[in-house]
A protein has these predicted regions:
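Conserved SAM-binding motif I beta-strand of class I
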Residues: 170-175
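Conserved class I S-adenosyl-L-methionine
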Residues: 143-155
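S-adenosyl-L-methionine
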Residues: 179-220
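A short SAM/SAH-binding and catalytic strip from SAM-dependent methyltransferases
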Residues: 220-230
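Non-catalytic accessory regions of SAM-dependent methyltransferases
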Residues: 1-42, 48-49
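Conserved SAM-binding loop of SAM-dependent methyltransferases across substrates and taxa
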Residues: 156-168
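Non-catalytic substrate-recognition/targeting regions of SAM-dependent transferases
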Residues: 29-30, 35-37, 56-127, 131
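Glycine-rich helix-loop-beta junction characteristic of Rossmann-like nucleotide cofactor-binding loops
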Residues: 132-144
């Protein structure tokens, strides 16, 4: 686990929610099952195979050492999630988790939940994708070129919030989970862009009429119409 320990020891004090270590990226085969995220003020360690108590103690000690340097006097707050063979479990390892828990990414507020469930409300490994969407939409400020976005598998609609902040005319968010879309509505409201969005549970009615599909296809690039998680 040395690559993870090195990442912890060298990390700077994060302000935004961000991924600190991405073992699944393939650069460190011995740590391919691990990721470390920061959802301020909580650290989230995820393992895709069971971890021993000794391994967790070593990681916790590494976090404690670095956190005492980055935030002297502040309690280390962290949780461990194990995802293995289709099951997911989460343990509070230290401190506490805010409720409600809001984080920011490049000035955008998102509601997250790191204490239970498999997903946390914001996929930090898609931060670069959200930056791309922001740049794409901002590059089309004129009324005739402003895009309308179809956000498939929208989850909690982070891409929608970013697109609307960047100037999109409208975003339609589709997802099977009404609960996730409800959090998405909170995210839009918290960022002042609720008026520009609509939310559709794909189980409640047909996805889109033919005319609606034509309307979106005429205003979006192929890369924006592809399925993307928030």
């Amino acid at each position: 686990m040395q690559p993870l320990f090195d990442a912890i020891a060298s990390m700077s004090a994060p302000v935004d929610a961000q991924r600190i270590f991405h073992g699944r990226g393939g650069l460190h085969p011995e740590c391919a099952h691990l990721s470390l995220d920061f959802f301020p003020p909580v650290w989230v360690l995820t393992s895709f195979k069971p971890a021993t108590d000794g391994e967790l103690a070593a990681i916790g000690a590494a976090l404690e050492r670095r956190w005492s340097q980055l935030a002297p006097g502040e309690t280390l707050q962290w949780v461990f999630q194990c995802r293995h063979e289709g099951q997911s479990s989460t343990r509070l390892m230290g401190g506490s988790v805010p409720d409600p828990h809001w984080v920011t990414e490049e000035g955008v507020r998102y509601r997250v939940n790191v204490g239970r469930g498999q997903n946390h409300g914001l996929f930090l490994d898609m931060a670069e994708g959200r930056r791309w969407v922001r740049a794409f939409v901002k590059a089309r400020p004129d009324a005739w070129s402003r895009v309308k976005v179809l956000n498939l598998f929208a989850y909690t609609c982070a891409f929608s919030v970013v697109a609307l902040q960047a100037g999109a005319r409208h975003v339609t968010n589709l997802d099977m989970s009404k609960g996730a879309l409800a959090v998405g509505q909170q995210n839009h409201r918290a960022n002042g862009v609720l008026a520009g969005a609509s939310f559709v549970s794909v189980l409640s009615r047909p996805l889109l009429t033919l005319d609606q599909r034509r309307n979106y296809s005429s205003s979006l690039s192929p890369s924006l119409t592809s399925s993307t998680n928030a």
